[in-house]
Structures are given as structure tokens and as C-alpha cells.
Amino acid sequence: MENKQEILGQYFTKIEIVHQLLYLLFSYKKYDNKIKILEPSFGTGNFIKGLKGKNYLNIDGCEIDKNLTKNPCDFFEMPLTKKYDLLIGNPPFSKYNLKESYFSLTNYFKSAVWPSLYLTKKELKKDKEKIENIFILKSLKHIKDESSSIGYVLPISFFIKNKNKSVKDEILKYFSTIIIYQNDKIWFDRNIPCCFAIFANINKLKNKIIVIYENSIKNEEVFNIKNIHEELIPQVIFHKNNGYIKNDKGIPLEEFLENKNIKVKKSYRENNISASNILEKNKIPANKLVENYKLAVVRVGNASVGKCGLINIKDDILNDMFYIFDVKDQYKKNKQIKETICQQINQKIDYFRNITCRVGSKSIKKEDVYNFKVII
């Protein structure tokens, strides 16, 4: 099958990482060895091996890839009557530009386990949804009782601010404690930013979100569970709290920039402005109308995210890598303000590189630009 790994969302967690994640889980949640466990997409079986190494033997597993098991089975076909004390593993991840890697409702119209039994109303209205989200939703229906837990490796993008809101809201119906763990190691055979999320009910941590980033030292932050829709990426929080993302002086750009969509000329092939030359566009020529110049900030790309330039909306053609901003009415003819903002953004490109941690290329939100502070 072409692109089989990406279509099936297969990213197999290294065994040494599995041991670390199991240690973390059992340090927070105590279970005896007789509990019933499900690994819903066991892949190469590293989580099952790790559990058996700790003498947890009552384990069921699902794996859809017939090349990895003699008895392939689809987790979405598993009867909801099967209940577990612990669901753990590494669900598949959807690749954003690969339709086949997403969960499609049409594939399960004839299923004995009708998706309406585990999907939210919002997900039922969608043609496709990220498969990791559907794994979470169905897993919630397999927990045995309030003492049950889920521990899944997830793309770090799951915890981006205001993303996956319906899934997060559903999680809160079952669990009052969330632990999000990330470290500086590579967990798969490729570097995919990810985390280990534990959903549980732990009395001493009721209504708490524990965010952990480990880089030889374990750095921990605690939030109220009401913050579930905020940005909860451990590495980003660590960077903010330890000075790697320092931007605490000045005035937020939202005081200078309009919150409007700006139309510009775009072309993938026939453009004269791209991330490779945007830094050259830091001045407004003396013979040009200042009001025609807008701020262009690169929104995506590991090496380019955060670069800024001044583009002429009458003359320039851009590729699709930019957010475009215009200043408020009182600044539209102010050349100095525009050039100063551009200069100060470019002096702190690392700020934007460190504030983001996504699956694939680094990317920023418009909100990150509006919150950036400048001294004018």
C-alpha cells in the first residue's frame, strides 16, 4: 500500500520510551496486577511487552495491520460491552493533508458498533475527523468505572489552545485529572512532536492538569482543569517560564494592528515574495505610498516561522506561507511605526520558533503575533 505508514497513522513508540511512560503512569495511578487492560492499536507490541515485563498479563489488544498480527482487528468494531481498568498505547495519528489517514464515518455505516454510540454530535456531522480524536472518544466508552484510566501517546497538537474542544469536553465528563508529559527525546523512528496524556480520577489531584516537561530535569506546572482549552504544550510552557520565550516589555501588537483579513495577491509558483526573501523587505521605498505596505509574517516552517517583512499589496505576489496584517487607521501613513514593528519582530524570531511545538513544521497562530510586545 502506497504511503501505508502515513495512511494508517503508524508511529511506533520506542521500547525505552514505553518503559519511561509506564513508570510515569504507575507513579500517579496505583493498580494491582490483575487489572484488565486494552491496547487498542498495538502495532509492534511495545506497550504490551512493557506491561508484561511488569507482570500485567490480563491484556487485550487490537491491531488493524495484518502484517503486524495473525489476527487483525479494528478497534472501532470492538463491542462497547467490553470494559477495562486501563486503556493504554499509541493510537494512530492523522496526517493533515492525507485524507485516507482520517476517520471516515462512511466506513462504518454497516458496523455492528454504530458510531453514534461513541461520537459526539459535532463529530457525527463531520465527513472526516482526526483518527486520534475518535480513538479517544471510543475509548471513553470502554472504561469500566471511575477508577479506570486512559494513557495515550498523542500528537502534541491535541493540546493547542481551543483545538479539539468537543473531544476535550467529553473527556471532562469522565475524568477530573489530566497529566500531560513531554520530554526532549525522539519517541518514534522520526521526530514527531508528541506527548503522553493520562486521563484519570486521582483524589489528591482532582480538577487539576499536571503539565510536565523533562529535559534531564522534570519541570512540572499545575493548572486548574478549567484551563483545558488553553495552550497546554509542556515544552512551550517550560520555555515561557524559564526565559526561553522572553517578551515581557513593551506594548502588544494588538494595540497597533487591525484584526481584519487582508486580501493580497497569491500564487504558489508565480510569486516574488516568499520566506526566502521576506527579510529583505524591511524598508518602505521613499517613492512609494506608505499606506500600501502591510506586515507579512511567516506562519509556518521550522527555519522561517516568525520572519517578517513589509509587502506592497498593489505590486507584490506572495506564496501561502504568510499572515498579513495592517496597522490601525492612525498609523496607516506612518512609515516609522511600520518599519519599527517589522524590525522588532525580526530581532526576536527565536521567540516565535520557541513558542510553537507542532506535528510537522512549526507554525504560529495570529494570536501569537497580536500578543507580541514591541517598544515604540
Each language-model region and where it sits:
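Adenosine-cofactor binding site in Rossmann-like domains, unifying the SAM/SAH pocket
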Residues: D60-P79
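Conserved proline-anchored active-site loop of SAM-dependent methyltransferases
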Residues: L21-L22, K36-G50, D74-S116, N133-H142, ...
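S-adenosyl-L-methionine
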Residues: M1-K30
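Conserved Class I SAM-dependent methyltransferase catalytic core
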Residues: L21, T120-N183, F196-I198
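Phosphate/oxyanion-binding active-site loops and adjacent basic polyanion-contact surfaces
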Residues: Q10-V18, D65, K128-F135
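C-terminal substrate-recognition regions of SAM-dependent nucleic acid methyltransferases
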Residues: K4, L8, D184-I317, M321, ...
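Short, flexible helix-coil linker/hinge segments at the edges of structured domains or between repeats
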Residues: S101-E123, K128, S166-E170, I192-P193, ...
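Conserved S-adenosyl-L-methionine
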Residues: G53-N58
